[in-house]
């Protein structure tokens, strides 16, 4: 099948937080760009059945796979919202669709403390600059706010209030967390005029009510409306090469157009002066490592693929007062055991469990610890893909687990009758970040060292944050995008 040839001033790969913010800032500057997204569009309508749910999973839950680690159901092969890639010691979940991971996430927007930030990014970025400019800008772009009091005190969010009450008894600080949620739509769910989604905790594969402020409906929609951004869904980028001559004056971006069952319908090549990689941790590492190891971009830094982190913690506790059978979401409350824990800072977010066993008083949490970025992606030529290696038995991870256990023990001791059913640092990571270390593989503005016109603007820049990473990804993307726009406008 012959490749069709195209030309674009700027090409963006991926439409998650990094790609969408870059697209919006380029559009505002009047710069034309093509955005390639491997997944489909997911328009939410009044029917309220756009996405699969945890209680009724189907092919929409997984990217071109008959299985998903999030369900035991056998799935039809479809271009669904989450790709699962097995690794050694750690598996990876990656978003797919126009809007990227914002479609199928908790929408949790946490800003790390100065100490947590220093642990992971302090050698590259100034926290004061991030705190005063880029975190507020990211919040404004996303449009996030904590759960309003009337929603929080409703019957649907009893589990969040129970968690907060237990934290108070244990003397563990907590706060309501900023969320990328339209609370007016949640109120409509509560009133019965929109399909029940967030209030039933049905948000893992997308939010059918439209309450999720996903990027395709917010800032990426603004970028498209400008007329400067051409979003091309179902476009799977397979390779990047230097343009003819390899003198650093541009890149070829090879990609396949597919249908919703994954069949290739046409092949394309776009040549561009500026290539912005925003394909997420998995996608960006996949493209760059493939380019280095196949000789397309052999001079990419040796640190490429390293410093991969996953700070995600999964816990479940039982023996509490009975909660509502369908727990309202997304996570409304964050425990911030950042200073009193002698073993290290721990964050815990109450996470809705839509089918928790009745009569047993379960609360589940997803949390974060500043676990060391010990993982690494490697290119496997037999698979023509990357594999994540994660040293699950490393002593540093055992220390992080001990910090989590300390927080949970305090909760159980302060709340007689409760107990921890399980706790572990996740082995299937939805918050895996890193592999393209900011300030090492790139400069501090996301420009790939030694490769003029090549940028990275997603979570692969970060080795971790100690809290769920989405807000930091967006804040760093806003910072990188300012330099990108300046470079394009100045032709530097």
Task: State the predicted function of each range.
Residues 1-5, 23-28, 221-225, 260-269, ...:
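A short acidic-Thr-Gly-centered motif at the start of a beta-strand
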Residues 2-119, 125, 277-279, 283, ...:
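N-terminal glycine-rich phosphate/pyrophosphate-binding loop and immediately adjacent elements
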Residues 7, 200-203, 238-241, 399-465, ...:
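A glycine-rich dinucleotide-binding beta-alpha-beta segment and adjacent secondary-structure elements
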Residues 28, 32, 39-54, 226, ...:
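Glycine-rich loop(s) and the adjacent beta-strand/alpha-helix scaffold that form part
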Residues 60, 123-236, 422-432:
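Conserved redox-cofactor binding core of oxidoreductases
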Residues 75-93, 101, 105, 110, ...:
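FAD cofactor-binding and catalytic pocket of flavoenzymes
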Residues 122, 210, 263, 299, ...:
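Alpha-helix capping and helix-loop boundary segments enriched in small/acidic/polar residues
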């Amino acid at each position: 099948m012959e490749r069709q040839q195209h030309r674009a001033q700027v090409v963006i790969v991926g439409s998650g937080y990094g790609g969408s913010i870059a697209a919006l800032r380029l559009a505002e500057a009047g710069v034309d760009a093509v955005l390639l997204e491997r997944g489909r569009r997911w328009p939410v309508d009044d029917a309220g059945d756009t996405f699969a749910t945890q209680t009724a999973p189907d092919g929409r839950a997984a990217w071109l796979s008959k299985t998903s680690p999030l369900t035991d159901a056998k799935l039809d092969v479809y271009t669904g919202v989450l790709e699962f890639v097995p690794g050694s010691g750690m598996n990876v979940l990656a978003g797919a669709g126009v809007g990227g991971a914002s479609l199928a996430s908790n929408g949790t927007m946490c800003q790390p403390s100065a100490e947590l930030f220093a642990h992971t990014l302090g050698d590259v970025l100034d926290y004061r600059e991030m705190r005063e400019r880029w975190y507020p800008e990211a919040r404004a772009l996303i449009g996030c706010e904590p759960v309003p009091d009337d929603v929080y005190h409703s019957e649907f969010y009893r589990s969040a209030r129970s968690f907060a009450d237990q934290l108070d008894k244990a003397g563990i600080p907590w706060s309501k967390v900023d969320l990328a949620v339209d609370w007016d739509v949640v109120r409509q769910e509560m009133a019965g005029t929109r399909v029940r989604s967030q209030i039933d905790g049905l948000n893992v594969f997308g939010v059918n009510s439209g309450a999720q402020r996903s990027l395709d409906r917010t800032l990426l929609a603004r970028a498209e409306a400008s007329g400067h951004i051409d979003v091309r869904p179902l476009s799977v980028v397979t390779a990047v090469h230097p343009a003819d001559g390899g003198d650093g004056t541009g890149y070829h971006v090879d990609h396949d157009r597919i249908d919703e069952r994954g069949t290739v319908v046409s092949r394309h090549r776009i040549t561009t002066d500026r290539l912005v990689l925003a394909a997420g941790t998995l996608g960006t590492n996949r493209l760059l490592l493939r380019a280095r190891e196949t000789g397309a971009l052999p001079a990419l830094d040796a640190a490429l693929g390293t410093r991969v982190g996953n700070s995600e913690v999964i816990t479940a506790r039982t023996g509490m007062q009975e909660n509502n059978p369908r727990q309202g979401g997304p996570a409304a409350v964050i425990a911030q055991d950042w200073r009193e824990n002698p073993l290290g800072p721990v964050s815990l977010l109450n996470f809705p469990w839509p089918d928790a066993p009745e009569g047993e008083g379960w609360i589940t949490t997803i949390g974060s610890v500043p676990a060391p970025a010990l993982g690494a992606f490697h290119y496997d030529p037999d698979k023509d893909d990357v594999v994540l290696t994660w040293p699950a038995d490393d002593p540093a991870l055992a220390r992080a687990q001990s910090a989590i256990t300390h927080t949970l023990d305090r909760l159980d001791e302060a709340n007689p009758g409760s107990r921890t059913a399980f706790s572990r640092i996740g082995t299937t990571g939805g918050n895996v970040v890193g592999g393209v270390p900011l300030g090492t593989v790139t400069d501090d503005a996301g420009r790939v060292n030694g490769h003029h016109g090549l940028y990275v603007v997603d979570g692969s820049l970060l080795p971790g944050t100690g809290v769920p990473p989405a807000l930091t990804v967006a804040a760093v993307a806003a910072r990188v995008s300012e330099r990108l726009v300046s470079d394009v406008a100045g032709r530097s």
